[in-house]
A protein has these predicted regions:
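N-terminal Rossmann NAD(P)H-binding glycine-rich loop of SDR-like oxidoreductase domains
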Residues: 3-23
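NAD(P)H-binding glycine-rich loop region in Rossmannoid oxidoreductase-like domains
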Residues: 42-72
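Conserved Rossmann-fold NAD(P)-dependent oxidoreductase catalytic core, especially the SDR/UDP-sugar
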Residues: 78-108, 123
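A recurrent short beta-strand within the Rossmann-like NAD(P)-dependent oxidoreductase core
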Residues: 129-130, 150-157, 169, 173-189, ...
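NAD(P)-dependent short-chain dehydrogenase/reductase
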Residues: 104-108, 112, 116-166, 170, ...
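C-terminal "lid/loop" region of Rossmann-like NAD(P)-dependent oxidoreductases
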Residues: 183-184, 192-222
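Adenosine-cofactor binding site in Rossmann-like domains, unifying the SAM/SAH pocket
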Residues: 27-42
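Amphipathic terminal alpha-helices
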Residues: 235-256
Length: 256
């Protein structure tokens, strides 16, 4: 297949693009790293699918810069959705679990708006808290890996491994979007308190109240996705255990 991936140099986009290329698909990488600005999006060749991952994330930043979130996540997405609808190209796009409490932040609002303007044949995947190699340094699991956690909260998070997110996207590329629902939740389906996963990692920090703009619990109902044959493979605790084991091994038997 020929697949356009917007945001292909981002966290999820990079993992997805690498797998698609290895599997022999043609991939058009649409992002600034490859000389394409999302505001100039166009399709001038035969394309089988568009995976729209380009966006500005980060709930806290959106409180300070709401305008850029609306412009990038909504206005530019609207252009992409309309172009693909006119050309009858199916779309898989990145939504967020933030839509369940969208009013709390400009980021959540922008994702809720994205879902509202999407056309039939355009499926939104509501990612929960994605972790893995390449995630932003400010994300909790990155801070755990780097031992830079300063405090924890009692907010509940559904951590989902980036490889499992990629497998969800690939499932729709394989099965197509015909007959599918407009949105699916992509998460492990199991929530864990932030303070508990931090403690599991052996990090001792104070527990504080989380920000009002953040969801208190983003645990996904992934039953619709599971019904299509998808299953998560790696939990947050398992990932932390692997990190701890690797760190210990490197200390007692460093690679030479």
């Amino acid at each position: 297949m020929m697949i356009v991936v917007t945001g292909s140099s981002g966290f999820i986009g990079k993992h997805l693009t690498q797998e698609l290329i290895l599997e022999g698909h043609g991939v058009i990488q649409w992002d600034r790293t490859h000389g394409h600005d999302i505001k100039d999006f166009q399709i001038d060749q035969d394309v089988d699918f568009v995976v729209h991952l380009a966006a500005i994330a980060d709930v806290r930043r959106s409180l300070k810069e709401p305008e850029i979130y609306w412009e990038t996540n909504v206005e530019y997405s609207k252009k992409i959705f309309n172009i693909c609808h006119k050309k009858e190209i199916p779309v898989i796009y990145a939504s967020s679990s933030c839509v369940h409490a969208w009013w709390k932040s400009p980021y959540g609002t922008s994702k809720k708006a994205m879902e509202a303007i999407a056309h039939p044949g355009q499926v939104g995947l509501r990612f929960t808290t994605v972790f893995g190699k390449g995630a932003r340094e400010t994300m909790l699991m990155s801070r755990i890996a780097n031992r830079t956690v300063k405090f924890a909260t009692e907010h509940v998070r559904d951590f989902i491994y980036v490889a499992d997110v990629v497998s969800a996207i690939k499932l729709f590329l394989k099965q197509g979007v015909e007959g599918k629902d407009s949105t699916y939740e992509v998460g492990s389906g199991k929530g864990i308190k932030v303070c508990d996963i931090v403690e599991h990692a052996g990090i001792d920090v104070p527990t504080q109240e989380g920000q009002d703009a953040e969801a208190t619990d983003n645990t996904a109902d992934n039953s619709k996705l599971r019904a299509l044959g998808w299953e998560p493979t790696l939990s947050a605790k398992e990932w932390v255990d692997i990190r701890i084991a690797v760190e210990y091994t490197n200390k007692v038997a460093p690679v030479r």
